[in-house]
Amino acid sequence: PAGPEEEIRELIPQMEMYCEKHGGEFLMYGLSEAQFALLDSWYPGRYQIEYDRDAADYIYESEKLCTLSGKKLHGKRNHINKFKATYEDWAYEPLEEDNLEECFQMALKWRNENGCEDDEEKNCEMCVTLNSLRLFRELHLRGGVLRVHGEIVAFTVGEPVSEDTFVVHIEKAFAEVPGAYTMINQQFVEHECKGYRYVNREDDAGEEGLRKAKLSYKPAMLLEKGIVTKVLEVSE
């Protein structure tokens, strides 16, 4: 649940009652340590949480994602420099009304090239991506696109989640354009995340390749999230 704390507190017992009425198990997904601490302060000992490493969000300092400074990110800077040297006509621009349809078509092409139709998980992910573009204005999202030879080769979509944190929901790039992922990552933060101390690039879903990629950017912290269940009452 989301909203004012007092309303959430009142809603929890109603959620429990709903689950009991319909024969379902009471579960809450994606709670952080701070959120569970608040829940436990309201209802001491009533709930328990099990954290899932695969669901942990990667939180980065926006300045470091923008500048890629330091020895640990030297390889990323090399990727950026090579990209700029290879594609001298590259360009970054914000995702707006006039390029939204073009970005949508790029996403469709990406889906076809990556076998999403034959992979249920990938297909579901692309449904979210395409719907985010369809409802881009209604959801008040922000985005950015990367062009090479005038064509969109990468794009990113996200939104602010607090005064100091911006979350990146979607990032897609053509694999045949080396460095496109690194470039859109850096450019998006530079242009769209100014004023935010942190960038949340979400979880890795337990995918080894994605985990390696996210760790390579040296996150400032991992935000653990877990599944909350009721503590079983043991009858004497």
Q: For each predicted feature, which ranges?
A:
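Conserved donor-binding loop and adjoining core beta-sheet/short helix segment
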Residues: 1-34, 147-175
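Short, surface-exposed connector motifs at secondary-structure boundaries
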Residues: 18-23, 88, 191-198
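Short catalytic-loop micro-motif centered on adjacent basic/acidic residues
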Residues: 27-28, 93, 198-201
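Conserved active-site alpha-helix within GNAT-family acetyltransferase domains
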Residues: 34-51, 78, 205-222
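Acyltransferase donor/substrate-recognition loop-hinge adjacent to the catalytic core
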Residues: 44-117
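Conserved catalytic-core motifs of GNAT/GCN5-like acyltransferases
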Residues: 49-58, 220-234
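Short, conserved active-site entrance elements at the starts or edges of catalytic domains
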Residues: 98, 102-151
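Aromatic (often tryptophan-rich) hydrophobic motifs at membrane interfaces
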Residues: 141-231
